[in-house]
Amino acid sequence: CHSLKYDKLFSNKNTVCYVILVWALTVLAIVPNWFVESLQYDPRVFSCTFAQSVSSLYTIMVVVVHFIVPIGIVTYCYLRIWILVIQVPRRVKPDSRPKIKPHDFRNFLTMFVVFVLFAVCWAPLNFIGLAVAIHPRLGQSIPEWLFTASYF
């Protein structure tokens, strides 16, 4: 069951283009930091990192573009995949009562776990950044251990 669309979308030429696109988007995401000067050394995490208090508007944009939009896209894609997994058996045998196969459920569960891990790993840092951007004085009241833990 190998789709012709897959061969067309993921040809060697297109795959190289996708890799170049990912790197170009990465550079595009980093460049604004140079102009806003938002990369600074933070002694709490012993690293040069994104300073959330430099520009509230910029921090909000970073959280939206780098966290909220990807979460929305991934949620939409996973829902579409799951709906397709549920609908395919009904299309093949419309009069029968299809059951979800164990491997289909396992695949969905794996995708869901990956999504949850992405959200769990990135949410604390992004929500702290969003809170600091909306209420800059809140930055001093965030416990150091919470801020440090959000990086790991």
From Swiss-Prot:
Induction: By cocaine, which increases the levels of day-time expression. Residues 35-58, 133-144 are extracellular. Its main location: membrane. It holds the Pfam family 7tm_1. It is a multi-pass membrane protein. GO terms for molecular function: melatonin receptor activity. It is found in: Cell membrane. High affinity receptor for melatonin. The activity of this receptor is mediated by pertussis toxin sensitive G proteins that inhibits adenylate cyclase activity. Belongs to the G-protein coupled receptor 1 family. This is Melatonin receptor type 1A-like. It comes from Danio rerio (Zebrafish). The gene is mtnr1al.
